[in-house]
Every structure is written in structure tokens, then in C-alpha cells.
């Protein structure tokens, strides 16, 4: 089937899913979760084939080790994927919510109401669990979606989507073609030109992918190109909390776009050596003089430096960061600590500003 027909089918599906009930959407999501659990061994088998093919690409230097790690599905990721779908089913329906009511004049009232976007084009690299996440969110928000995954995970992607659509086929009155998938670079080129049918493009991947998408389409793009994330350990921080926060932010999923890449430590923090030693025990490679402070490692590698005060930390983050996710570890038990926290929260130029305190 050519891409234009896929896009037309998606547009038709978007109009139909916008008209179904919350109960039907939630029933579909629960069915998807059940089917993924039922067929998880087949999904693992498909993923094993992708991993074998990807290993040869790693050996040849065509993909990185971090890309390989994102590709891998295991029992933990499978469990999280299934639970994530069930959690989305439990969420309040985001559609048809009154967001604003304003009386403009006598007998004239303005209502701002949430509604579906329409057709989403999702382009992603390596991570096959993205299919389940995006499909579930699309269903809950009453949108149709066209997925294009990386070639490294093609077998896993096909299997997961096959399971999802098999589950949807069992739900009476659920519209067809809500979740579709394409596979080639030609399909991507067609997707980027298809502003007649596609309402929003969401790229999920590295810097090169996101920039390419933004530069080659007239369709609105929702994407973030870099994940240069920081943690600032203030002078008052609790050492145990600092160790836990930094270790988890680097090791839980090193290739995630919100994994920490740079650690900033107040020069008056009394246990700098203890913190760095604990990180090394967690097999984190520390770099104190990197070639670039704007490098996304995607691995268990962490650049670090000491700073004189919270203002120097903020200046560093705003200069070298990507505005994604940044965190301060401090206390909230004294006036100075609270001033540092509030200043960090106000002045850091980040979409997500995390505050980790002991009260």
C-alpha cells in the first residue's frame, strides 16, 4: 500500500476514534496489555533476532553500543510496558475537558475545550517499547498514529504492532487503522510532505534525527534534539541522598535522553570525595575535564566539576545544557538553602526542573 493511502486511512480513523467512548478506549487498552502479556515470548523471540543483527552493526561501527542497549527488551522492560498501558487506561480521559470558560458578553460565552489532534506521525530510533507507549497514548487521547521505527528493531516493531492490532480487532466497534506502521526511508520522505493528512510529527531519537525532521517538513514538529542534563549538588546536600540521586540518574537507563550527563558540585560540599568514590563503585566513569560540556554520552560516563556557588551552576547549565531536565540536590532546613533552591528553580532555563530536598 502506498503511503498516501495509509495517511488517508489514518485520517478517516482519526475522525472515528474521536467519537468513541472513554469506556471503549479503556477496554481496548486493557485488551492490548493482556495480549502483549500473552504473546511476550514471541515478542522476545523477534527481539532476539533484532539483537543478533544489531550486534553485527555494533561490531562494524554502524551503530553505537547505547543504541544497541536501547533496542534490547527484557522482562523488566516488558513488565513496565504492560503496566504502563494499564496505567494509561486508568487515567482520566483528556478529551472534551473544559479548560476555560469566559463570559464575553451577554449571552456570549467562550469555552476552551480539549480535543484530539488528529493524525500523528511518530518517527523513532531503536526503542521498540515506544510502539506500545505511543499507541496507548494515541488511543487514550483519541488520535490516529503512523509509526516509523528504526531498521534495527524492525522484527520487534512488526511483532508488537501485530499483537496490538490483533487486540484491537477483538474490540467490537473499535475503528480500523488507528495504529499503522511504515518501514522505509521513502515512507519517511512521504510522511514529511503529507501535511494534508498528518497534523503533528513527533521524532524520538538523537540530535541528527530531530534536526533533520524539523528542517524537512511544513508539518508542526514536537521534538527535543538533545539531552544534556545536569545535577547540581549544593553545599548543604545530604551525602546519602546525593549518591542515590546521581547514581540512579546515570545508571538506571544511561541511554535515556533525561539521564544525567554532567554533575556540578558546590566547592563547599564537605563530602565531594565520598560522592565521587561512591559513583565509581557503581561503575560510572568520571571525567573532570571533558573536551565538550555539551556532549551526550548515552552511557555510564559522567563529566563533573566543582562550582563556587549556585549562580555559577546556573550559568553553566544555561550555557551548555539543552533545556531538557536539570536537578538540584539540597536541603530545605535553613534560609540560605531555600534561597538556593528558589533561585535555581527560577533561573535555570530547563523544561523540567527537579528539586530534591531533605526537609
Explain the meaning of each model-derived region.
Residues 1-110:
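N-terminal Rossmann-like NAD(P)+-binding subdomain of aldehyde/semialdehyde dehydrogenases
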Residues 3, 22, 128, 239, ...:
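Residues at or immediately preceding the N-termini of alpha-helices
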Residues 9, 125-144, 170, 209-301, ...:
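ALDH superfamily catalytic-core signature
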Residues 90, 98-240:
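Rossmann-like NAD(P) dinucleotide-binding subdomain of oxidoreductase/dehydrogenase enzymes
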Residues 118, 199, 261, 326, ...:
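Conserved acidic residues
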Residues 254, 264-359:
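NAD(P)-dependent aldehyde/semialdehyde dehydrogenase
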